[in-house]
Amino acid sequence: MKVLQVIPSISVVYGGPSQMVIGLASGLAQENVEVTIITTDSNGDSGQKPLDVTLNCPVKQNGYEIIYFRCAPFRRYKFSLDLLKWLKAHACEYDLAHIHALFSPVSSAAARVCHQQKLPYILRPLGTLDPADLRKKKQLKRLYAAFIERRNLADAAAIHFTSEQEAKISERFGVVTQDLVIPLGVIPPEKVENGGSLVRSQWGIPQDSPLVLFMSRIDQKKGLDLLIPALEKLLESQHNFHFVLAGTNSQDPDYERKIKEQIANSALRSHTTITGFVSGELKASLLQAADLFVLPSYYENFGIAVAEAMVAGIPVVISDQVHIWQQVRDSKSGWVGATEVETFVKLIGEALQNPQECQQRGLNAQKYALEYFSWSAIARQIIQAYQDILTK
């Protein structure tokens, strides 16, 4: 089986939902699927230099290949005429395409090319069909859907959702297309010798202070307006902890600056470390150091950062708008609550006051994630879905 993965960018600056295509491709390759990723060299939306990669020819890694094409960005909208020309010429060599992202010109155009070339394709929305997400730039998206994405959804072989909740709430624009509900996978972080201690020493975090970690994009939907006041209240009530804010937002630097200023003008400032974007050994070390992971998002179609924390053995405190909240609750992998400040005061406080329970829920989280969020298990589910589509 030969499969194309099409995505606007796989740069690390776009976070887990884009990076997951790398894990998926590797998992599929291990199951003897021939995989080609086609993408652009986009590397951020605020004037960053493009990725330093070879363009227009295959780069082989981990059993699959990636072909990068020059991106012609307009603000955060990505387009590549070279990618589309390549797709039109080579679509006939593949059995199926898996297209990631809606409301992105390069993905939308790729869907039309696939349809014209009679290549079956699956669309993964990445949360863009969530009503909360559709409210952003509402009029533009309504027009875009009416003239472009509605037809793309109708012509798709299936829509790939990553949770039952995402499938349940997503807008379909009147289209009836088959759903695939298959979660994302995570790769367990490599152990860094004394990584947790080194991180604490590097940033002057007391060894006896529980480390509360937020590791995600600094975005308005992530609920930092709930988390920061909740942590302030916990400080007022004499709870001992150190907060680490790990993330950035190349698409909205003004909001990132606002959050940093809010913390700088708060009692939290002497109990907080702001790291910026982290990856590699530093990210793995932070996950080793963390005692609790928090994500009070207003909406999250899956929550890849939560799954990464779970597979690292960290108990999680999340909102019931992170769409894997039921798995977290049922597996006793952490605490789940409503998007309210007082709820997070209560849940984080309960976790901090019960270190043994915290540790047990971390073990539960790791066990669950290794079983259900491993790329090998997910790749097999996706291959079965591909085969079902191709035999219809």
Describe each region flagged by the PLM:
Residues G334-E342, E350-Q356:
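Conserved acidic donor-binding segment of nucleotide-sugar-dependent glycosyltransferases
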Residues K49-C57, K191-I205, K258-I259:
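A short helix/loop element that forms part of the nucleotide-sugar donor recognition site in Leloir-type
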Residues N43-G44, V186, M215, H242-K258, ...:
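Glycosyltransferase donor-sugar binding loop
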Residues P315-S319:
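Short hydrophobic beta-strand element within catalytic cores of glycosyltransferases
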